[in-house]
Amino acid sequence: MATKTLKVTQTKSSIGRLPKHRATLTGLGLRRINHTVELEDTPAVRGMINKVYYMVKVED
């Protein structure tokens, strides 16, 4: 059974953002603008995405 994944892309810079938000981007594996990672769709990942929703784009 395949697990559902999400494609998360960083759309804005982390410069000048709250330290916790910068750490959340790092936790998601995002390093720079337009960097895309595929992550499993879990409640923990969804919570991290919700925290930095204004800096990322999510595709199913």
Curated annotation (Swiss-Prot):
Q: Which Gene3D superfamilies match?
A: Ribosomal protein L30, ferredoxin-like fold domain (3.30.1390.20)
What processes does the entry annotate via GO biological process terms? translation
Lineage, uppermost ranks = Bacteria, Pseudomonadati, Pseudomonadota, Gammaproteobacteria, Alteromonadales
Asked whether the UniProt record includes Ribonucleoprotein among its keywords, one would answer yes
Family from the record: Belongs to the universal ribosomal protein uL30 family.
The protein's organism comes out as Shewanella loihica (strain ATCC BAA-1088 / PV-4)
Protein name in the entry:
Large ribosomal subunit protein uL30
One short Pfam family name for this protein? Ribosomal_L30
What quaternary structure, including any partners, is listed in this protein's UniProt entry?
Answer: Part of the 50S ribosomal subunit.
Question: Which terms are listed as keywords in the entry?
Answer: Ribonucleoprotein, Ribosomal protein
Q: Which CDD domains does this one have? A: Ribosomal_L30 (cd01658)
GO MF entries = structural constituent of ribosome
According to its record, what are the GO cellular component terms? Answer: cytosolic large ribosomal subunit
